[in-house]
Regions:
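Accessory, non-catalytic peripheral segments of nucleic-acid enzymes
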Residues: 10-11, 218-373
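Conserved residues at the C-terminal ends of beta-strands
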Residues: 19, 172, 274
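Short, surface-exposed connector motifs at secondary-structure boundaries
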Residues: 19, 45-50, 265-268
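Short loop/turn segments immediately following beta-strands, especially the blade-tip
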Residues: 214-216
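N-terminal active-site segment of His-dependent metallophosphoesterases
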Residues: 1-35, 349-353, 361-373
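His/Asp/Glu-rich metal-coordinating catalytic cores
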Residues: 15, 24-199, 204-207, 212
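Short acidic, S/G/P-rich loop/turn micro-motifs used as interaction or catalytic elements
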Residues: 23, 109-110, 276-281
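A generic secondary-structure signal
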Residues: 3-11, 39, 120-123, 253-260
Length: 373
């Protein structure tokens, strides 16, 4: 937020659009909200238009409500801030931009809305003007939905957006960067993503978007993705094998993967180790100082590592077949082969590894099993 005034000046921005979820209504602090509105005030006379989303929904005791904000803070909303306060799409005109009509609405509750708002918006007050919509909703493209991990709300399709009468749609809800362009290459709608990544579900690209809206969209040459996040959150998988038997060798493989992917010194990284390792390898240990030259913070998850037990040799060994370990492996192999689905196989394989660890006198270590199962 503190970098916003400089960005506005540098790019000669005429209006700032915020399509929702600036905060989480259930936990937002007075400090956060006032910092936000103070930053918007510094942009004056450039107008800022806000369309409250499902997380920062509008209600009588919302900081978006002018009277409540004044009672809580002792001051008014900045004069350059405009908030859509109706759950029904309405138009907004700003004296500074008389040739532009802005449209938008607000959420009043944090609940999914199934109405396809965009498909029903076909009539404009002044079609000859530039017409811009702020929409907090879900692109219902299958891949976009899967990667977002979010419930569908105010769903729309690419086809519905491209067929709409709006020259540009500022999109909010998904925390990753997505653009929707017409056949001429002009951008008709875009999610900037969350400006500052905060979790493992926000490892994708995310920007503040700047562009010149014209009739028919934003030309690709006038569309800029600007990163204001000084660091990135990574989720990196590092494959190990039986040859890696000590923590130093494991760290060197992690460091090589960091270099390959371009992890920076200010970044935070969640590292998932996976693969079949020597059965006598119980766990790898790392000192936080090991990572200081590579990144700001790192967490290592070893739950996907599996001991590379030679099950075929155990089953072929006549002596083992008469012992508990051989009988256990044979029984578990039969259970796995007759499992009804992959989820059941995964659980049974974890049970096999737990059992072999116990029979070999090794510590029982948590094995990865998909949380859905």
């Amino acid at each position: 937020m503190d970098s916003l005034p400089e960005l506005v000046r540098e790019h000669r921005v005429q209006v700032v659009l915020c399509p929702g979820d600036l905060w989480d209504e259930e936990s937002v602090s007075l400090e956060t909200v006032t910092h936000l509105f103070d930053a918007f005030e510094k942009l004056a006379p450039v107008p800022v238009i806000l369309a409250p989303g499902n997380h920062d929904f509008y209600h009588d005791c919302s900081y978006y409500e002018p009277g409540y904000y004044e009672r809580k803070t002792g001051r008014r909303h900045p004069s350059n801030v405009r908030v859509f306060t109706s759950p029904v799409v309405e138009s907004l005109r700003i004296p500074e931009l008389p040739h532009v009509d802005f449209y938008g609405c607000c959420f009043e509750h944090n609940v999914p809305q199934t109405e396809r708002i965009l498909a029903g918006l076909q009539r404009l007050n002044r079609p000859e003007n530039l017409n811009v919509l702020l929409l907090h909703g879900s692109l219902d493209d299958r891949l976009a939905v899967q990667r977002s991990g979010k419930d569908l709300t105010n769903p729309f399709s690419r086809e519905e957006l491209l067929a709409s009468p709006f020259d540009y749609v500022a999109l909010g809800h998904y925390h990753r960067y997505i653009t929707i362009a017409g056949s001429d290459g002009c951008v008709r709608g875009a999610y900037g993503g969350i400006p500052l990544a905060r979790g493992l579900d926000e490892t994708d690209e995310h920007y503040v978007l700047v562009g010149e809206i014209r009739k028919g969209g934003v030309p690709s040459t006038e569309f800029k993705e600007i990163s204001v996040d000084p660091r990135r959150i990574w989720r990196i998988t590092v494959a190990l094998d039986r040859s890696i038997t000590n923590s130093r060798a494991t760290f060197e493989r992690i460091a090589a993967e960091f270099r390959r992917q371009g992890v920076g010194k200010d970044d935070m990284v969640f590292i998932e180790l996976e693969g079949l390792v020597h059965p006598d390898t119980e766990a790898f240990f790392f000192d936080s100082q090991d990572f200081e030259s590579l990144c700001f913070h790192a967490v290592v998850d070893q739950s996907k590592l599996e001991p590379d037990y030679d099950l075929a040799s155990i089953l072929a060994d006549e002596a083992s077949s008469k012992q508990v370990v051989g009988q256990f492996v044979r029984q578990m192999k039969e259970e796995i082969e007759s499992a009804k689905d992959d989820a059941q196989k995964q659980i049974l394989r974890a049970a096999l590894l737990y059992g072999l660890d116990a029979l070999n006198g090794k510590p029982i270590r948590r094995r990865y099993v998909d949380s859905k199962h």
